[in-house]
Amino acid sequence: MTVGVLALQGAFREHRQRLEQLGAGVREVRLPADLAGLSGLILPGGESTTMVRLLTEGGLWHPLRDFHAAGGALWGTCAGAIVLAREVMGGSPSLPPQPGLGLLDITVQRNAFGRQVDSFTAPLDIAGLDAPFPAVFIRAPVITRVGPAARALATLGDRTAHVQQGRVLASAFHPELTEDTRLHRVFLGLAGERAY
């Protein structure tokens, strides 16, 4: 099984390292053709407005939707979660509303956990994990609405931080910035369920 990491910007190298620690075959995705034969794809953290622009300019926007429709597992972390969302709030007032791929029935508020200087790590109880996960929040979004098709798997206080809808995961935090590979293992399990 081979999974991909969107490698346009952001923390893609760290995701690749975590996946390789688990023995997964990993391909960096920069072009639509790079999606061929993958079982899953991670959309990493970075800057969501830039990521949307690069996806659009690089011709990946619609192929990502097709990849999902064909059964590919997806996991968006931080900015990647924003890109997967149906509705995105809190973009710059000087820009038009930021589109999301709409593959996850959630509303996301950008940068809701604060600015770069407000970054923090917190133990997060995540459904399905046996112990708290050391979640790293950096200019992190908050999932403000979880639609009926999705389910919240973790909250920090009253803020949703991790959700799942079928074979799509979204995390408001950066799991790749820890040595803990449990969520990457969960993602590989979802990717392994793909039937070609």
Swiss-Prot record:
PROSITE patterns: PDXT_SNO_1, PDXT_SNO_2
Keyword Transmembrane annotated: no
Positions contributing to L-glutamine binding: 46-48, 110, 138-139
UniProt GO BP: glutamine catabolic process; pyridoxal phosphate biosynthetic process; pyridoxine metabolic process
Catalytic site positions: 78 (nucleophile), 174 (charge relay system), 176 (charge relay system)
Pathway: Cofactor biosynthesis; pyridoxal 5'-phosphate biosynthesis
The UniProt record lists the keyword DNA damage: no
One Pfam family of this chain: SNO
InterPro entries recorded: Class_I_gatase-like (IPR029062), PdxT/SNO (IPR002161), PdxT/SNO_CS (IPR021196)
Catalytic activity, EC: 4.3.3.6, 3.5.1.2
Keyword annotations: Glutamine amidotransferase, Hydrolase, Lyase, Pyridoxal phosphate
Subunit record text: In the presence of PdxS, forms a dodecamer of heterodimers. Only shows activity in the heterodimer.
Family label: Belongs to the glutaminase PdxT/SNO family.
Function, as annotated: Catalyzes the hydrolysis of glutamine to glutamate and ammonia as part of the biosynthesis of pyridoxal 5'-phosphate. The resulting ammonia molecule is channeled to the active site of PdxS.
NCBIfam families the UniProt entry points to: PLP_synth_Pdx2
Protein's name in the database: Pyridoxal 5'-phosphate synthase subunit PdxT
Protein source organism: Deinococcus radiodurans (strain ATCC 13939 / DSM 20539 / JCM 16871 / CCUG 27074 / LMG 4051 / NBRC 15346 / NCIMB 9279 / VKM B-1422 / R1)
Organism lineage: Bacteria, Thermotogati, Deinococcota, Deinococci, Deinococcales
Gene: pdxT
